[in-house]
Amino acid sequence: MAKRLDLKDLNIYYGSFHAVADVGLAVLPRSVTAFIGPSGCGKSTVLRTLNRMHEVIPGARVEGSVLLDGEDIYGPGIDPVSVRKTIGMVFQRPNPFPTMSIRDNVVAGLKLQGVRNRKTLDEVAEQSLKGANLWKEVKDRLDQPGGGLSGGQQQRLCIARAIAVQPDVLLMDEPCSALDPISTLAIEDLIDELKQDYTIVIVTHNMQQAARVSDQTAFFNLEATGKPGRLVEVDDTEKIFSNPTQKATEDYISGRFG
């Protein structure tokens, strides 16, 4: 678990449109890296290339490489489905299968992989719900629909579903943007616990959240409309927020633009 990601000369295209240019950074294991920047700068686009989710969009392609412990996830013969098992994704809005039970939501990925043993599935469901700090709240209603949970509980259910297949990396695309402050705090506390076992990359528009949860922060920016987004600066979060090297970074985190 908790593998290193290295992005090298990453360029992302949608058809002829050059969306993101020349990104290079290292994401260290057992740490949280935050992607910040104004809307349209490419941070979510970069996030989705880290497990090849962008490929669901027609015309999407990448140049450069994304290495997971030295292996290029875009290399010949690499199955995108196996990549997404190793590098899990938690989306902006909670997306449990609404009519599926809480238990079945958690183990849906395992069932797709052919796991059918009930004891194994029950053990994984319990372990994953405990890992997502949700077990105590739902252990007496595992057969009820996941869609009946609160928004914050649904997001933790989605995190439980993601970790049930034992990924090495967790990607989170604004996981708290649709949640209230109390639920947001619960997710942030969970992220701090999860980084002991996983490599985590989070996209957030909340500067305070980035400062609270991340060890490293990468700031992306857009030069102009129609131009590709670029990585401006990446460093330890404390340094990014206290003494950034680029003026654009300072202007963004201080609220002068964005």
UniProtKB/Swiss-Prot annotation:
EC number, as in UniProt: 7.3.2.1
Binding site for ATP: 37-44
Pfam families named among the record's database cross-references: ABC_tran
Membrane topology listed for this record: Peripheral membrane protein
Transmembrane segments: none
Annotated InterPro entries: AAA+_ATPase, ABC_transporter-like_ATP-bd, ABC_transporter-like_CS, P-loop_NTPase, PstB-like
Reactions catalysed: phosphate(out) + ATP + H2O = ADP + 2 phosphate(in) + H(+)
Enzyme class, first EC level, given as a word: translocase
GO molecular function list: ATP binding; ATP hydrolysis activity; ATPase-coupled phosphate ion transmembrane transporter activity
Keywords tagged on the record: ATP-binding, Cell membrane, Membrane, Nucleotide-binding, Phosphate transport, Translocase, Transport
Every ABC transporter domain range: 5-247
Keyword Glycosyltransferase tagged: no
Subcellular location: Cell membrane
Main location group: membrane
Protein family: Belongs to the ABC transporter superfamily. Phosphate importer (TC 3.A.1.7) family.
Known partners and oligomeric status: The complex is composed of two ATP-binding proteins (PstB), two transmembrane proteins (PstC and PstA) and a solute-binding protein (PstS).
Name the record gives this protein: Phosphate import ATP-binding protein PstB
Primary gene name: pstB
